[in-house]
Amino acid sequence: MRAPLCLLLLVAHAVDMLALNRRKKQVGTGLGGNCTGCIICSEENGCSTCQQRLFLFIRREGIRQYGKCLHDCPPGYFGIRGQEVNRCKKCGATCESCFSQDFCIRCKRQFYLYKGKCLPTCPPGTLAHQNTRECQGECELGPWGGWSPCTHNGKTCGSAWGLESRVREAGRAGHEEAATCQVLSESRKCPIQRPCPGERSPGQKKGRKDRRPRKDRKLDRRLDVRPRQPGLQP
């Protein structure tokens, strides 16, 4: 009877030791391994509760997730402090790093940072800095250029009125590290030389008769009467 009883006691002791070791793994005190900084930790899922002031970062790999306690959230995440646990949350899709969900610090490629937002292009009046990916400062606009030739449908003649325009470019548009600022332009109405060179004026048509008053035409005919030569019969 003693042998089976001793064997039963040994099995019970082994089960107790196994349960104790499992509890030790699940309750970490920050002494090392993947449970550093954890209050509750499991071998399968890592940390689920962190020590005070630390942030819980959940890394997802497929359907599995693994928790880790960090002093600072990794790039692409920002920290939110809560009553029970501090968590790391992912930044917006266009942010490389952020201060909060609505305020980016650095943008991903093809986007520019402007007042905490990541935009595909910088707004008018700002310069796009290619190295920092930021929209910086106000554009320094240069003076207005000269007026263009007055044209109508691409021609400088043949019409009564046309349009002329001028532009005002940014003073720093040639900066190597900056994109061109928005160019300002304005147009105004202008008179055009109505007949083009070599063309008849609109009032002159081919084969048009003399439209002077009849009495003037008769006077010209009277003045054009030539004296008859002697010996010629009428």
Swiss-Prot record:
Location of region: Disordered: 190-234
UniProt signal peptide: 1-19
Coiled-coil regions, chain positions: none
Record: glycosylation sites: 34
Biological process, per Gene Ontology: nail development; positive regulation of canonical Wnt signaling pathway; positive regulation of Wnt signaling pathway; Wnt signaling pathway
InterPro entries: Furin_repeat, Growth_fac_rcpt_cys_sf, R-spondin, Rspo_Fu-CRD_dom, TSP1_rpt
Compartments, record wording: Secreted
Domain comment, as recorded: The FU repeat is required for activation and stabilization of beta-catenin.
Protein name, UniProt field: R-spondin-4
Lineage summary: Eukaryota, Metazoa, Chordata, Craniata, Vertebrata
Gene field: RSPO4
